[in-house]
């Protein structure tokens, strides 16, 4: 259940203040003396009231009271005489005067003095009044509380008869209503209604006053909203209707549902119980339009999260991580030339929450040689340095306990610097931080202490001597003081040559504002105060002022620092800025630099990111350029965007810049410190303050403001209109574009009912502020309000207005409807809706599925498809085409089997359009076949040669064998013929011996023949075998050579094929990139055309902003698309190379296997080889 935030804006008012006490009252400036006044404070602490016998009741709003002091004895003789007349002599006044300081801004201050009967009452009232003022929370009370406050004011401002004049009431409603209407309304309420009538305060209750406001100023706008919620069917809202309204309109949809639960019936009933005046409706759980109106005007519907007004931020980060409320030339009450200096300004500025004030210190010229504060030689009046230090001591920690930085611009001699040091030491005491904290030594790389570390401490920002120089001069000072020499410790070093501070290149000019013209003469300077008075009285012309400006020459701050003052400088040591790179290398966090607005803008223009990084580490101070002699202010937002801590402004000028400053620093308990966003503090984050695209980690927002109506805007019958601006990053800043129509002759309750002013894309809500301002028909500001976007509440809200000095106006409010959403780019609304409400999205899809089932379509027949929000069919086709070349994972590309590789590269989704390469295809290539043919020819030629050699050797061997056989046959035949012839001649019986010899010879011949045959066969076998072996070796050699050539050729062909694949893929990628660029150009043109034709865009500035935003968005989107395409293409190329490498490795493996197989065949052949012959 959503819990109500308990806004405890009241401070406890002591009983003695409520009971009152009698004082004599006087004002010195206008000589007003009023004795025996009964002063009181109401129970809420709204008013300090007083009344004396025979006079009308008077009130002073406590919100306008700046300080309560013990008053000094008046110097005006008339006042003293008046007090003497009532029995209070001058001698009796010591310690009996209460000074009440009040004003609607920081410059126009009024002083009311109250003289008590005794010092005890004075002390009691000073403490009591101090305890109830500076109630910043009370500046944010609801419109209902403001009405009650106004009613109380009317009741206090009674006439001499102690009654409320009807005329006082008519003045409240003077604008837009005739007195007759008011008189009639009073009459209907049973109250006196004549023009000169009086009303008893007891009869004029708050409920009567509220009813009167509703009669005279009816809230028709809320009535219309009420009817819209209930459909104009009833006079009440039910609990369900109220819950629905609260969740749909009054709750920021971006909020966490656990930390900020939705409203439920129980919470709605609590609201009805609290705000519904009709008891019967309350019992029935219903709320009327009156109860609804009361609820909308209550604290529960504040325009900001009220806890942001408390101290809610962490205060333990280094000082450099905070924005610090800072003042420039704090002492001035007006212009920079001839202006008046005032000690009071220091009080007012510090009480307003400022934490850095400036003191321009110069040598006093009087006999007492007292240091003074003035604007150099710019014809401004002087104030005493010691008075300023006293004022700072009294007010530094009244409204905030966090550290105050005194920015010295030191032009004083060493003598007067010593006096300055002693004043700071003696008056501030323990408040002055004279030495660095032990936990945060002054060392490079060491972070600055936090605001919590420096609570109730005053730091001095001034140049510091080099450590060795400071030590040397301090020792000399100490030795001379111990020696008891007559020389004063303040001036013993006065004649020393000026020593360099930290280094010669580190001199810093706090105000290099005017560096032209000749220095003024001593005579001119002698008339400075007279000139200042002339300027104040308007006797000096603009030409005179311009002449003085032209002759003015800025005198830089001294570098001849007194060592005693130097020792008091620690965490705010100014140095001359030498560049961001130098500062980063030095890494000295306690060094800081000052930039006038022009120089600061120059660095922002050229080194924005470096400036942000610099401000993460050390502090920077920005101050107005010298040309702002009218004390106008620059726009601080641009420097907050860069993380500059001390964006110093002229507090005396309540212009737009100061309004932004005061509105921003109202958060975090008005303590003067605001923690910078995370990305502006972390060294690992990069932030460009000129970015036009959302920052990483930061969700952009859409903010729309519908201005519905205004209430009590003016007591005059005038026309009014409302402007709504936003300030933030340059891309978030929209000003002078959104304004309502003019509603004439009605300052009381104008109804604007404008269409919503939409700030469509706020990329950095943390730095953005909303400004709502009301102007009259003469373009004069009536009231304004600054609302930081990071604490803005959504819904129908009443926005109470402030004056130009940020003081709350009593009754004026603007009724608005504020809508806050997460920024959703065009075309993504459906997706975001589905994500934010998946149940609703699912219910729609389920309903459609049910409808399809009713038509006979089964759920299983419905495919799950991705959501497509594209409005461009061609874009969809392009996306489909791009999807065809999306690479798969590496696991899908990796071949898992030899067979898969042997069959070629598998089809890959990303590279499937590239022709596949298979080894079989390589072997069918013409070059390979031609090479095979050539190799076969070589092999055939060798075989033919071998066959010829075979034939030749075979013939030779056969001839040799035939010759041996023939010789054997011949010799055998010869022996047989001799035997035969002998047997014929001698007879068979006589030739036995011869026959026996012949047989022996034949046997011997046969044996010899066999031996010869055996020898020749062995020789032939050897020769034939050697020839066969030689032929086999030659054939094997040429086969090996051919195989190697085949492998090399296949590898070469594969590499060529790979190169062609790569080239084809490159061409495909080039074509793809070209198509994408053309498609992107087309989208950009179509989008620009759509914006130019969009009739809902009503002004040129918004159209240009949309085009600029579109171009920025498209640029980022297109670059991302191109980056993704390049990554995809790179991945495809890598995948292709990987597959090609795997294929090449496979081919080499296959080649090795072929060679191994051939070697095995060779070995088998050798093992099977036997001696052979052809015979």
From Swiss-Prot:
Q: According to its record, what are the GO cellular component terms? A: cytosol; plasma membrane
Enzyme Commission designation: 3.1.4.11
* Active site per database record: 328, 375
Bias (Acidic residues) ranges: 493-508
Q: Can you state which reaction this protein catalyses?
A: a 1,2-diacyl-sn-glycero-3-phospho-(1D-myo-inositol-4,5-bisphosphate) + H2O = 1D-myo-inositol 1,4,5-trisphosphate + a 1,2-diacyl-sn-glycerol + H(+); a 1,2-diacyl-sn-glycero-3-phospho-(1D-myo-inositol) + H2O = 1D-myo-inositol 1-phosphate + a 1,2-diacyl-sn-glycerol + H(+)
User: Residue limits of the PI-PLC Y-box domain?
Assistant: 565-681
Q: Which residues carry this modification: N-acetylalanine?
A: 2
**What does the tissue specificity note say?**
Preferentially expressed in the retina.
Which keywords annotate this record? Acetylation, Calcium, Cell membrane, Disease variant, Hydrolase, Lipid degradation, Lipid metabolism, Membrane, Phosphoprotein, Transducer
Protein name in the entry? 1-phosphatidylinositol 4,5-bisphosphate phosphodiesterase beta-4
Task: Give the signal peptide as a residue range, or say none if absent.
Answer: none
Mutating residue 328 to R: what's the consequence?
In ARCND2A; likely pathogenic
The PI-PLC X-box domain extends over 313-463
Effect on the protein of changing residue 360 to N: In ARCND2A; likely pathogenic
GO MF terms held by the record: calcium ion binding; phosphatidylinositol-4,5-bisphosphate phospholipase C activity; phospholipase C activity
Please describe, based on the UniProt annotation, the reported consequence of changing residue 358 to V: In ARCND2A; likely pathogenic; decreased function in phospholipase C-activating endothelin receptor signaling pathway; dominant negative effect; no effect on localization to cell membrane
Against Pfam families, the record matches this protein to: C2, PH_14, PI-PLC-X, PI-PLC-Y, PLC-beta_C, PLCB1-4-like_EFh
Q: Which InterPro entries match?
A: C2_dom, C2_domain_sf, EF-hand-dom_pair, PI-PLC_fam, PLC-beta, PLC-beta_C, PLC-beta_C_sf, PLC-beta_PH
Give the cofactors, semicolon-separated: Ca(2+)
Residue spans of biased composition, Polar residues class: 881-895, 1085-1094
What role does this protein play? Activated phosphatidylinositol-specific phospholipase C enzymes catalyze the production of the second messenger molecules diacylglycerol (DAG) and inositol 1,4,5-trisphosphate (IP3) involved in G-protein coupled receptor signaling pathways. PLCB4 is a direct effector of the endothelin receptor signaling pathway that plays an essential role in lower jaw and middle ear structures development.
Region of interest (Disordered), ranges: 482-511, 863-895, 1082-1110
**Compartment(s) where it occurs, according to its Swiss-Prot or TrEMBL record:** Cell membrane
